[in-house]
Amino acid sequence: GTKAMQEFEPDCIIAVGGGSAMDAGKIMWVMYEHPEVNFMDMAMDFMDIRKRVYTFPHMGDKAYFIAVPTSAGTGSEVTPFAVITDETTGVKYPLADYELMPKMAIIDSDLMTNMPKGLTSASGIDAMTHALEAYASVMATDFTDGLALKALKSIFTYLPRAYNDGANDPVAREKMSIASTEAGMAFANAFLGVCHSMAH
């Protein structure tokens, strides 16, 4: 992907897909704009995203990054995170920096209409976990709490409907797409806890 970008030289990058596709797009964006960057430097452990040993390069000078989710769960379209898996070792590298934040997110629940039940439930529980962990975070604020609680209310109301009725309930699909983004906005600012650490 990065090689194709370097050859084409786009001024706008649109990542369409689930969390993995959007996260891959973020890393391709970094490597396109800053080919000198070392991936392992970006993947260095840290205690606080705001106090880093490694400084991410400034993003957006070459290309505008737009994220378009096709599943309601990861919230990657509104977060400064990307999880990249080394396919040879199976090791997951969580990258975190506000420079990874997409410049725009387009939330269109029509793209999620035909999600299979398994993806609907798994991604819905992911969104619920994001909201719960953001709400319980020691870095939570009144602003993140509002987003997290609203997301949780919507998920508990609409996830069963989206799972059971799928494409026949566009309202549930729309509400879940919004809830996923709200949960993403909450944890982008309040961060996550031990659940996600253990899962990765």
Q: What is the predicted role of each segment?
A:
Residues 14-18, 72-74, 123, 183-185, ...:
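Short glycine-rich loop/turn motifs that provide flexible caps or phosphate-binding loops at active sites
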Residues 2-3, 7-107:
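Glycine/threonine-rich beta-strand-loop-alpha-helix active-site module
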Residues 80-189:
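Carboxylate- and glycine-rich phosphate/diphosphate-binding segment that chelates Mg2+/Mn2+
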Residues 190-200:
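C-terminal catalytic subdomain
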Residues 27, 181-185, 200:
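Contiguous, well-ordered alpha-helical segments that form the cores/surfaces of helical PPI scaffolds
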Residues 12, 36-39, 139-142, 166, ...:
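Secondary-structure transition/capping residues
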